């Protein structure tokens, strides 16, 4: 079985914590032009109270054509090289990492009120730490509405979560330290 059982992470709180800390998702989506997947990177915000991710993309992004389809959201956490020198040369080199994979259904948002709500949530969340915080209301409503016409607003409803946390769980305590 791959990944090995000791690297699999099933604790939903840990999976959600990684997604919140590293919100840039690589999204694999079906491509109507071929059997290949299209891939795009999109920052998303997970709303745990509703169990949905929210995001927006350019109107011409292929993801905007995936309404009612299933996609994969891939999140990568911290990663690093593990040198054998950390274990007195008793192990082979390795790479430590954590990742989360979410299968989700796509819902393209059509309501202007919902689009504005999503933009407000995204900007207020991602503007944290900036002083002063920029607000979408700094843009006149007519300009916002014109900009929204160039975007597709999306909700992703998760149907399956899985994680792969390869953090030397199979190594001795000395190597893990």
Predicted segments with their positions:
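A general structural signal for short secondary-structure junctions and capping/turn motifs
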Residues: 16-18, 63-65, 144-149
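Short, basic/aromatic recognition patches
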Residues: 1-26
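A generic structural signal for short beta-strands and their flanking turns/coil linkers
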Residues: 23, 40, 49-53, 67-71, ...
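A residue-level signal for conserved active-site and pocket-lining positions in enzyme catalytic cores
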Residues: 33, 104, 154-156
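Short, structured beta-strand-loop surface elements
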Residues: 59-118
């Amino acid at each position: 079985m791959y990944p090995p059982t000791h690297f699999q992470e099933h604790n939903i709180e840990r999976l959600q914590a990684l997604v919140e800390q590293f919100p840039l998702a690589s999204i694999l989506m079906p491509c109507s032009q071929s059997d290949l997947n299209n891939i795009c990177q999109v920052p998303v915000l997970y709303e745990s109270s509703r169990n949905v991710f929210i995001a927006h993309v350019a109107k011409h992004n292929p993801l905007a054509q995936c309404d009612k389809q299933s996609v994969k959201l891939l999140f990568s956490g911290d990663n690093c090289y593990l040198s054998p020198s950390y274990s007195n040369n008793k192990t082979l080199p390795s790479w430590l990492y954590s990742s989360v994979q979410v299968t989700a259904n796509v819902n393209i948002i059509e309501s202007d009120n919902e689009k504005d709500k999503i933009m407000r949530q995204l900007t207020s969340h991602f503007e944290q730490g900036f002083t002063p915080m920029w607000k979408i209301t700094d843009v006149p409503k007519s300009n916002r509405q014109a900009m929204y016409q160039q975007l597709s607003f999306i909700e992703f409803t998760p149907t399956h979560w899985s994680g792969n946390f390869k953090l030397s769980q199979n190594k001795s305590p000395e190597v893990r330290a």
